[in-house]
Design a protein with these regions (language model features):
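Terminal connector regions
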Residues: 125-170, 246-270
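Asparagine-centered strand-capping/turn motif at beta-strand->loop junctions
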Residues: 70-74, 194-199
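Short, hydrophobic/aromatic beta-strand segments
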Residues: 76-84, 149, 202-208
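Intrinsically disordered, low-complexity Pro/Gly/Ser/Thr-rich segments with frequent PxxP/GP/PP motifs
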Residues: 99-126, 219-245
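Surface-exposed binding patches on compact interaction domains or structured appendages
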Residues: 73-121, 214-217
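Beta-sheet-dominated interaction scaffolds and their linkers
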Residues: 47-73, 172-188, 226
Length: 270
């Protein structure tokens, strides 16, 4: 009753019957507006879904080929196309371009719902014996033609698989990987990790944790994303601690190639 009285203040000229008729009219208007707005929102149509195993491939002079399984776990048939790309980096940023160093067959195939396709990958170019070569194989879903009158957006799945051709001599990553730490803004807690991979093969970082090197190992900042640093590459990793950093020394624990490696670093200001 109190709510009705409050609402009547906005309709001083209406009686109770007129008020309820107006309320129902407004409700109908809101309903019409809702359907008009909803009709303007594009419909998103998802194509099929597929998975791959393994999720990375390593080849070498002694192992020049590999097999991958692509499984359609969805309820619809789908078509998948393969693209082979050479993978390089400039200051740690990925650069991709088409390559014929590797072959993958079949390059395009239909994948019925619930089925599995075998992909065979092989080397067409001899590996460089001193430095690892890196590639990316893109598995791209080709969505079917939209039905007549469909005005929405079709979303197709794309998976990128790293492929490495190992050099003949591989040195331990931790012996050829360097991390230095700089603070670009002490008050705001901005940290720059200068990373350098001097080795002949890639380094995969699965996360970095930075602690105060004061014996208590209080966590200062962390980076939880996955990244690759290819052979001979460098990268500046920018991390924000979200608070002022008082420590002068740091203990950096890097989850690198499946193991945790520790680095001691002193703070510097670039």
């Amino acid at each position: 009753m109190m709510m009705c009285s409050a609402n009547l203040k906005f309709f001083p000229q209406l009686g109770w019957a007129d008020f309820f008729r107006a309320s129902f009219s407004m409700q109908a208007l809101y309903t019409v507006c809702f359907y008009i707005i909803a009709s303007c929102i594009p419909v998103v149509s998802l194509a099929g879904t597929f998975s791959v195993n393994p999720t990375r491939i390593e080849l070498s002079k002694g192992i020049p080929s590999a097999v991958m399984h692509v499984t359609n776990s969805g309820e619809k048939d789908t078509t998948v196309q393969l693209h082979m790309l050479q993978w390089s980096q400039i200051d740690g940023e990925d650069q991709l371009k088409a390559s014929r160093d590797l072959i993958a067959t079949p390059q395009i195939f239909n994948l019925p719902a619930g089925s599995r396709q075998i992909i065979r990958i092989g080397m067409l170019k001899k590996s460089d014996g001193s430095v690892e070569a890196a590639y990316r194989m893109i598995l791209e879903e080709i969505p079917p033609p939209p039905p007549p009158g469909f005005l929405g957006l079709q979303v197709a799945l794309k998976i990128s698989i790293p492929i490495f051709i190992k050099p003949e001599l591989i040195s331990k990553a931790e012996n050829n990987f360097e991390i230095n730490l700089n603070r670009s803004n002490e008050e705001e807690g901005n940290i720059h990790l200068n990373m350098l991979n001097k080795g002949s093969s890639h380094v995969q970082l699965l996360g970095v944790k930075i602690f105060a090197d004061d014996g208590k190992e209080n966590l200062v900042a962390s980076y939880e994303k996955n990244l690759y640093l290819l052979a001979g590459q460098k990268k500046i990793l920018k991390i924000n601690a979200g608070k002022k950093i008082d420590s002068k020394g740091f203990l950096i624990k890097a989850n690198m190639n499946g193991g945790v490696v520790e680095f001691h670093a002193k703070s510097g200001v670039p």
